[in-house]
Amino acid sequence: MDTIIKTQIIDLIHREVIPAIGCTEPIAVALAAAKAAEVLGRKPEKIEVYLSANILKNAMGVGIPGTGMVGLPIAIALGSIIGKSAYGLEVLKDLTSEGLKEGKEMVCKKCIGIDLKENVDKLYIEIISSAGNDRSRVIICHEHTHIIYVEKNGEVLTDLRTANASGEEVCENKDLRLSFSMVYEFAMEMPLDEIRFILETAELNKKAAQASMKGNYGHTVSKTVSGAFGRKFMGDSAYTHMLIMTSAACDARMDGAMIPVMSNSGSGNQGIAATLPVLSFAEDIQCSEEQLIRALMLSHLMVIYIKQSLGRLSALCGCVVAATGASCAITYLMGGNKARISYAIKNMIGNITGMICDGAKPSCAMKVSSGVSTAMLSALMAMEDKVVTSVEGIIDEDVDKSIANLTAIGSKGMEATDRLVLDIMTGKSC
């Protein structure tokens, strides 16, 4: 692998693996609101919000950090009042009790309008803020922090829109298309000092899990597994330790805890699921630091690779992708070679492909746990040279083609499913 490609991959990882506080979809909306307020130069009196279906779906039922509230209005209000766009996905980290009170007052004034925007990218956020005769407009598209358009009082300040900005574009980095072999080679052969930074994912996400265990968040999936019934019927093993640590961080995050996590490809839950099963297993088997670094890099880069063709948001639950990365890493830590790691990927795809995304919410911790369970099973089977074959379902002999089949189903094949899920969610009486 030449130096240019290595540098491109490192840059890609630094761009995709970043800290985030709160579910990334409502936080991205808060980021756009913060930028619109900054450009406006004053507190907005009216805010119009236009969102793609996937952003709307993922922001409806999830807790907003530090508020005890759920949904978009409070996220938009706080972004406009106390948000700082320079913080990116940590836009609300300066929240105070005074700021929260002011945000609640803005929500009560009903000056925030939220509407669905049709025929746009799956990740599309448009904010129009106004006060008096002043008006600002901000658009985020393709990526959670990618501000492509800024306007104030009719003057265009930034315009990165392209001819297909309102269409589907799932991979912004056209100069670097990853493959399984490229991911494996990079993770296994890079000098440790050049990839040691990936340990930051373990440090930050483990802190989130530890903080979660001190409280009661969401459906307390982690405490259920570690509780009396969990210990009695599931035991105490490397497997249950993985479930406990991973679901703990997700429990807290989905419930709106003011706890930062390291995200992957715009998703905190993907960052959690790519990190904590690997870290937990590594701690249980007492592997070396080098093994942990390479395992984490393999997991995170595999997630990035799959998301290149799947897209930021889809009808497919992101835990399928993230758990696939984790399964690769677990197989490696078990002593698996490249062939067995490819078996783990095929086993994952042959098992939980098709799990729908019905928005970000506390029960995501249960889906993450399902992904972790399948990751362990897939790794165990791979180590026994058991693999879903190319005569079965969507699996191809070529592992990259199998991944392409998975992402085609998630990005194209489930579009009608995505629309139906949103219709069901928005049509409920609750």
UniProtKB/Swiss-Prot annotation:
One annotated GO biological process: L-cysteine catabolic process to pyruvate
InterPro entries named in the record: Ser_deHydtase-like_asu, UPF0597
Q: Name one GO molecular function term.
A: L-cysteine desulfhydrase activity
Origin, by domain of life? Bacteria
| Coiled coil (UniProt feature) | none
Query: Which Pfam families does this one have?
Result: SDH_alpha (PF03313)
HAMAP family the record matches: UPF0597 (MF_01845)
Family, as annotated: Belongs to the UPF0597 family.
Instruction: Write down what this protein is called.
Output: UPF0597 protein BDI_1130
Species whose genome carries this gene: Parabacteroides distasonis (strain ATCC 8503 / DSM 20701 / CIP 104284 / JCM 5825 / NCTC 11152)
